[in-house]
UniProtKB/Swiss-Prot annotation:
May act as a soluble regulator of keratinocyte differentiation. May play an important role in embryonic skin morphogenesis. It holds the Pfam family KRTDAP. This is Keratinocyte differentiation-associated protein. Residues 1-22 form the signal peptide. Keywords: Differentiation, Secreted, Signal.
Length: 102
């Protein structure tokens, strides 16, 4: 099932606007003991190598598909199959070997 993108974007922007207006109207109660300096950890954590996998990041930047727009667009199309990708205008000359005459 293909979902048209324009109504989805309009609905999401309406929901975001409603949430922002609701957040602006609310009066949160601020407790000073919740935001004190004593609640924060004293020791610095430093670099956590468990979450910074540099070898994986380097291999991603050195691959042939890095900044390959064909692969990136195909990845987005496969990640979001419910979006009607035929709705968007095609950019001339991107998929053909020779650019189309303008």
């Amino acid at each position: 099932m293909k979902i048209p993108i324009l109504p989805v974007v309009a609905l999401l922007s309406l929901l975001a606007l409603h949430a922002v207006q609701g957040a602006a109207l609310g009066h949160p109660t601020i407790y000073p003991e919740d935001s004190s300096y004593n609640n924060y950890p004293t020791a610095t954590e430093g670099l956590n190598n468990e979450f910074l996998n540099f070898k994986r990041l380097q291999s991603a930047f050195q691959s042939e598909n890095f900044l390959n727009w064909h692969v990136i667009t195909d990845m987005f199309k496969n990640a979001f199959p419910f979006i009607n990708w035929d709705f968007f205008p095609k950019v001339k000359g991107l998929r053909s070997a020779a650019p189309d005459s303008q």
